[in-house]
């Protein structure tokens, strides 16, 4: 069942006009992106506009390339690709073989913020490579083409200090016949790989995605610090995330309609899973599809407190062909190190009752606090 999120009344408010504040991401990321003193502010009406603005920011006044970029950027995106999204929705199985579309931010370390206006939409991805201090907010990504070409909605490679906040990412949790290796029709919502750490994923609405996100692309790509908070995952298959090593702090998320597996903690990683709401979920906390080097988890104050709650919330489990560990006893298997940032989680019940008013696009970047839970 699709989880319906209400829209803000001021549907066309330009969020970039709001006052800027120092970053408080509620997680490992500490970046303001490009929204700092001396930033150049630009408006983009298309994917190509964003590409052109970023390329220009790599050059000095004499047209010479500046390592890491010449100046920080704030890009307000007001394009609308609803027509492309609707066409893709009408031809789900035709998207996998199309060319991937995306903005590549490569070797840019001065800082970039990309923020969508309310009502904007994108049928293209944003791919980060060897950059840092990137913020992506209020962007609506739908039905990415080019699954055969790794056409992710957001890809973070060799890029530390990233904040992905208040976005919507959606496709169809569906398998089309004939895709390579039985792979999914669409690629990932948010993949985080290689030397990418100190990343915060917050207040996103992610639905209809089969492979939601990686933390590490192989068994040797481990050791990052990631926070996932106040996200809604609805009708998703797996990888929430698929964690290879490192530390993940997942708090105040709503997981509903998980069709295969949820938080999959592998390669000796550890996850702090705190004050989340789980319902209608298969294998919501597990270590599988690997066969060795299991991860561990610490469970704190989620709506599910013991196996006695599984039937109430429709939590189910299955086996894997390789050795695996499920949280079927709903007990912690590890102890998370101290969290190095300040955060104020609400109760799991408040997540269930109120998060839909805050997660996703067109919410004017509003956040859920304890005062909103009454």
From Swiss-Prot:
The keyword Transferase does not apply. Ca(2+) binds at residues 150, 152, 187, 191. Residues 1-22 form the signal peptide. It is an enzyme of class 4 (lyase). GO terms for cellular component: extracellular region. It holds the Pfam family Pectate_lyase_4. InterPro entries: Pec_lyase, Pectin_lyas_fold, Pectin_lyase_fold/virulence, PEL. The active site is at residue 239. Its cofactor is Ca(2+). Its EC number is 4.2.2.2. It catalyses: Eliminative cleavage of (1->4)-alpha-D-galacturonan to give oligosaccharides with 4-deoxy-alpha-D-galact-4-enuronosyl groups at their non-reducing ends. Binds 1 Ca(2+) ion per subunit. Involved in maceration and soft-rotting of plant tissue. Belongs to the polysaccharide lyase 1 family. PLADES subfamily. This is Pectate lyase 3. It comes from Pectobacterium carotovorum (Erwinia carotovora). The gene is pel3.
């Amino acid at each position: 069942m699709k989880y319906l999120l209400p829209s803000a009344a001021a549907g066309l408010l330009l969020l970039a006009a709001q006052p800027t504040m120092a970053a408080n991401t509620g997680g490992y990321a500490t970046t303001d992106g490009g929204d700092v003193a001396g930033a150049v502010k630009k408006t983009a009406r298309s994917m190509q506009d964003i590409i052109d603005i970023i390329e220009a920011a790599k050059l000095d006044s004499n047209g010479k390339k500046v390592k890491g970029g010449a100046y920080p950027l704030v890009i307000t995106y007001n394009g609308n690709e609803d027509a492309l999204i609707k066409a893709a929705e009408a031809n789900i199985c035709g998207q996998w073989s199309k060319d991937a579309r995306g903005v590549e931010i490569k070797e840019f370390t001065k800082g970039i913020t990309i923020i969508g206006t309310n009502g904007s939409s994108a049928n293209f991805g944003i791919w980060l490579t060897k950059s840092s201090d990137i913020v992506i907010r209020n962007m609506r990504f739908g039905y990415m083409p080019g699954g055969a070409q790794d056409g992710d909605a957001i890809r973070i490679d060799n890029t530390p200090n990233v904040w992905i906040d208040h976005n919507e990412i959606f496709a169809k949790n569906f398998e089309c016949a004939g895709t390579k290796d039985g792979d999914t029709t669409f690629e990932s919502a948010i993949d985080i790989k290689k030397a990418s750490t100190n990343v915060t994923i917050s207040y996103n609405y992610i639905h209809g995605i089969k492979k939601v996100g990686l933390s590490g692309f192989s068994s040797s790509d481990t050791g990052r610090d990631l926070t996932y908070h106040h996200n809604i995952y609805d009708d998703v298959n797996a990888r929430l995330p698929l964690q290879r090593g490192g530390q993940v702090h997942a708090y105040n998320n709503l997981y509903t309609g998980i069709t295969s597996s949820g938080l999959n903690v592998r390669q000796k990683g550890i996850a702090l899973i705190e004050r989340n709401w789980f319902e209608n979920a298969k294998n919501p906390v597990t270590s599988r599809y690997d066969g060795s080097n299991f991860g561990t988890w610490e469970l704190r104050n989620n709506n599910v407190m013991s196996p006695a709650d599984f039937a109430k919330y429709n939590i189910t489990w299955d086996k894997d062909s390789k050795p695996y560990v499920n949280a079927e006893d709903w007990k912690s298997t590890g102890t998370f190190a101290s969290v190095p940032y300040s955060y104020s989680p609400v109760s799991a019940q408040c997540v269930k009752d109120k998060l839909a008013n805050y997660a996703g696009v067109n919410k004017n970047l509003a956040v859920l606090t304890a005062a909103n839970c009454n």
